[in-house]
Amino acid sequence: MASHSPISRFSPLTSNELELVLQWRNQPHIRQNMHSQDEITWVQHEAWFDALKNDESRCFFVFYQNDRPIGVLNFSEHQSTPYTLEWGCYIGEDDVWPGSGLLLEIAALQYALELKGAAVLYAEVLSFNKSVIKLHTLFQYTPLEDGREFKRDGEKHVVKRFEYKREQWQRNKPKVLSRLPKQISAAANFIQFDL
């Protein structure tokens, strides 16, 4: 891929991307990091999309990099007081711009805490998903008490929980962005949301 900064555009999911998103959701490397590892059928996927369209507390964006769909970023209302959004994401394509995961982190913080005015951005990560835990640490999320325990493949794991308060992001943003590779900081200027 080209080394110049990509345009990272986040567009609400439409029926046009449904088949592609189902392919992504069913990829083993994506399913293994979800609460449920079950393969999703087309009927289940359509029912999920119908429910999503009628639920104002959730939004689901397709992540376009230079007009090519490569992943998703989603939000749901975690609680109303204080207004807290929970987020999740994944990249479904292999050949993406280096640092795309970092751009998802930045986009999530910008959308929730700047565009939507949430007081808190909340995240849950399965304890074996070390790369995402590392990203949240790099971005200075506040770790919370661990969530529920669960077993997968005979091993015990926990749900790691994190939050980021709006005032914390306002204070930390310049420092966090300055610690990232220069090409990532530059690419952060090209994050767009189709609202």
Predicted feature residues:
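Residue-level marker of structural boundaries
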Residues: 27-30, 39, 54, 141
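Juxtamembrane/interface motifs at transmembrane-helix termini
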Residues: 40-43, 52-54, 91-92
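An amphipathic alpha-helix signature
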Residues: 15-22, 42, 46, 50
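Conserved GNAT-fold acetyl-CoA-binding loop/helix
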Residues: 29-47
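Acyl-donor (CoA/ACP) binding surface of acyl/acetyltransferases
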Residues: 2-20, 24-27, 67-195
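Residues that form generic nucleotide/phosphate-binding pockets
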Residues: 24, 33, 48-52, 179
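A short helix-loop-beta-strand connector motif used in the catalytic cores of GNAT acetyltransferases and
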Residues: 50-62, 71
